[in-house]
Amino acid sequence: MDKLFKTSFRFIIRFLQILSLPVVFPYFLLSFLACLITSKNYESLPYNYPPEIRFKKVYRLVSMWLYIKGIKVVTVNDKIIPKKPVLVVANHKSNLDPLVLIKAFGRLKNSPPLTFVAKIELKDTVLFKLMKLIDCVFIDRKNIRQIANALETQQQLIRQGTAIAVFAEGTRILSNDIGEFKPGALKVAYNAFVPILPVSIVGSLGKMESNKRLKEHGVKKSSNYEVKVIFNKLINPISFNQIDSNNLANNIRSIISDAYTSEKPSND
């Protein structure tokens, strides 16, 4: 009976959301255009656009997109997020994951602004301008010098008060397994001496993926409308500074995997 009630309630909510789309969608398009214009102006006049303005624009745009898609972001243990910058390390199941993290961080008072480390290939996408608006750091894995420069950029952003998120698996894992974590993704935490916040994202598997790609991997898209963001216990730098990065990566992977497994929806 409880499940039936939840299903019925969800149906009503989604129905009302769909009815509101003729109003919401044009506003979303206008907001998207405004973000693109702001991003272009930010490149030429960066000091005219402080982080609180730029990040807020992107947060609002992401919130509207999630509303349009009918996706609800649920956070667990969000009170442990500190006001100071952290390195967020999360699992990666879908292109939806960065948007979910933006939503989870952006709606919390006093949380630091959040940006991402992303692959250089994303520069060829329409999202590049939006990513630049929140100071995303792009990495070319084939260029050692560029990787070093990107690491310095990450440290600079942290000094300026921005939290950085990395998907340490390095790619989307289209299964319920958690992939191996790359220790290089944690280097900025060592260099900048900042806490690490392990985050488990549950319920995004297969979302924003083509049916062809899902079929190739034998994956069924999650039918759950909720995506859960679990903030695991903060790891302070004094506790990992002397630990080998490979061991630290394995420890963080275990933390994220345990929380993911315990919260994974049955239909994922």
From Swiss-Prot:
State the EC number(s): 2.3.1.51
Per the record, the GO terms for biological process are: CDP-diacylglycerol biosynthetic process; phosphatidic acid biosynthetic process
Q: Which GO terms describe its cellular component?
A: membrane
Reply yes or no: does the keyword Lipid biosynthesis apply. yes
Q: What is a GO molecular function of this protein? A: 1-acylglycerol-3-phosphate O-acyltransferase activity
What is catalyzed by this enzyme? a 1-acyl-sn-glycero-3-phosphate + an acyl-CoA = a 1,2-diacyl-sn-glycero-3-phosphate + CoA
Its keywords, alphabetically, are:
Acyltransferase, Lipid biosynthesis, Lipid metabolism, Phospholipid biosynthesis, Phospholipid metabolism, Transferase
CDD domains attached here?
Answer: LPLAT_AGPAT-like
Note whether Lipid biosynthesis occurs among the keywords.
Answer: yes
Pathway given in the UniProt record: Phospholipid metabolism; CDP-diacylglycerol biosynthesis; CDP-diacylglycerol from sn-glycerol 3-phosphate: step 2/3
Motif position, HXXXXD motif: 92-97
* Family per record: Belongs to the 1-acyl-sn-glycerol-3-phosphate acyltransferase family.
Q: Domains: what does the record tell us?
A: The HXXXXD motif is essential for acyltransferase activity and may constitute the binding site for the phosphate moiety of the glycerol-3-phosphate.
Which function does this protein serve?
Answer: Converts lysophosphatidic acid (LPA) into phosphatidic acid by incorporating acyl moiety at the 2 position.
Q: Spell out the protein name for this chain.
A: Probable 1-acyl-sn-glycerol-3-phosphate acyltransferase
